[in-house]
Regions:
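Hydrophobic alpha-helical transmembrane bundles of multi-pass membrane proteins
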Residues: 8-414
């Protein structure tokens, strides 16, 4: 008969296998939820742009996801984590294929970068140059900062910990994903210029109201629901999952909605972007904050979006169609800072965070994004061009690029 210690060891591989399988399922569900968020990006843009650009919004988001998958699989994931997929399927499927679903999950984050940018450059950007920009951004620019923040690349995180007592903390990507996406979008929008006819010679703003409020609302709701996978599943293993993340996400969402409702004066566009502003901001500290801190974070984010969207469009004449710079860029940066404020034990948080480290990490993300955005879009504008010509823009991207509109006037019978 085998000794007791030997018998006790027999179930262990089975238990480990079960744990790996559970973690795979957990992360896979998160990846699917965040993948579904890309439908939200598509419908949010579709409902906001004019009718002649609706098809382009749908096609652009899906195409950008495909390009992102290729860029991240072959280049980006290696840049960020030093890992690659040039091994046998037998090796890749170890631990029930956990590393594979982790890649899938992180890919859905990476693909959010061009989805964010898409909303800012809508209605006048050329299709193929944007696909090239997507490949470069997801293959090189985004994973460069992702690796710094989430894989300790280049030694910034150890230095922050040694200097300030804590690393830069971004649990689910307020800065790594949203601020980076929003701050890349800003130079893209500036280099493209405003839509023709948006601003008149006498300084007035020509109104371009949303073409379809129901689709805009649908997009916002899809994003909101998927966000709970974005945040909660960022734990990446079942043993680290926390209900605090879910509740904080909820409270920030509510805070953003209420602030946008009041300051936006019941405007449906503001109200449906309000919860997104709150959720963008809470990503970084959702695992640290007290729910009241998360509520305040969301309230500030909702107000920040409404005020800065109005300023950029009306006073600064920056034609950011969906307001992705204030929504993702500014609210994401606020979220990185808020994690250092409301994550502190003095304000009911879990602690283990430094405001100085949060400020430095957030600023670092902004610098990388601005530099990468100007480099990529500046090179493309100087070489192949990034903007539709006046006639194409007048006709609309749907007819110009895709040869069909969202609602054709007549059918062709063969």
């Amino acid at each position: 008969m085998a000794p007791a210690w030997c018998l006790a060891s027999f179930p262990e591989p089975k238990m480990e296998q079960t744990n790996h399988a559970s973690n795979v399922l957990f992360v896979l569900l998160g990846a699917i939820m965040v993948l579904a968020m890309h439908a939200g990006f598509a419908f949010l843009e579709l409902g906001t742009v004019r009718k002649k650009n609706q098809v382009n919004a749908l096609v652009k988001i899906l195409t950008d996801f495909g390009v992102s998958a290729l860029a991240y699989f072959f280049i980006g994931y290696t840049v960020a984590y030093g890992a690659h997929f040039f091994a046998s399927a037998e090796v890749l499927s170890q631990k029930s294929g956990y590393e594979m679903v982790k890649f899938f999950f992180l890919l859905t984050f990476a693909a959010a970068i061009p989805a964010i940018i898409s909303g800012g450059i809508a209605e006048r950007a050329r299709f193929h140059p944007q696909s090239i920009a997507t490949f470069l951004l997801v293959g090189f620019v985004y994973p460069f900062f992702e690796g710094i923040a989430w894989n300790d690349n280049l030694g910034l995180q150890p230095w922050l910990e040694a200097t300030f007592g804590a690393k830069f903390h971004d649990f689910a990507g307020s800065v790594v994903v949203h601020a980076v996406g929003g701050w890349i979008a800003l130079p893209a929008v500036l280099l493209l210029g405003a839509r023709r006819g948006r601003y008149t010679k006498d300084g007035n703003v020509a109104a371009h109201p949303p073409s379809n409020i129901p689709f805009l609302a649908l997009g916002a709701w899809i994003l909101t629901v998927g966000w709970f996978g974005f945040n909660v599943m960022s734990a990446q293993t079942l043993d680290k999952v926390s209900g605090l993340v879910a509740l904080n996400s909820l409270m920030a969402m509510v805070g953003g909605t209420m602030a946008a409702m009041v300051l936006g004066k019941n405007d449906p566009g503001f109200i449906h972007n309000g919860p997104l502003a709150g959720l963008v901001a809470v990503c970084a500290g959702s695992d640290l904050m007290h729910p009241i801190g998360a509520l305040i974070t969301g309230l500030v984010a909702g107000g920040l979006f409404v005020q800065l969207f109005t300023l950029t469009q009306n006073r600064w004449k920056i034609d950011d169609v969906l307001g992705v710079w204030p929504l993702h860029g500014l609210c994401g940066a606020w979220g990185g800072i808020a994690a250092g404020i409301f994550g502190a034990k003095a304000l009911g948080g879990m602690g283990g965070v430094s405001l100085a480290a949060q400020l430095i990490g957030t600023l670092g993300g902004i610098v990388v994004a601005l530099a990468g955005g100007y480099l990529v879009y500046g090179l493309l504008r100087a070489t192949i061009g990034i903007r539709l010509d006046p006639e194409e823009e007048y006709e609309g991207a749907d007819l110009t690029i895709h040869k069909i509109t969202a609602t054709p006037d007549r059918e062709t019978h063969w």
